[in-house]
Amino acid sequence: GTATDRGDVAESQATQQVLGSGKPISSMKSYLGHTLGACGAIEAWWAIEMMRRGTFAPTLNLTTPDPACGELDYLMDAWRMLETEYIMSNNFAFGGINTSLIFKRIYD
């Protein structure tokens, strides 16, 4: 999210409502900050690379999620091994740059 009190809560609740509780979630923004117009491309690459490798990055500096946020599996502290067929990249940025992309694993 945009790291605002209302934005992060609304975004996490919407994610839970659409995908259900307990879905693993992390944020690359904790690594790069606000990249504005580049956020979609960077986030898409990051998501695909994590799915390809089967290792998912934690959100840096996240120790206790806001209790008002959706009931999701917030990746904290350490990289996690996860195998998945799909990954979703959300971008909710300043100025209404909002995208959600879903990628499916392709086997050679």
What function would you assign to each model-found segment?
Residues G1-D108:
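Conserved "HGTGT" condensation-loop signature of ketosynthase/thiolase-family condensing enzymes
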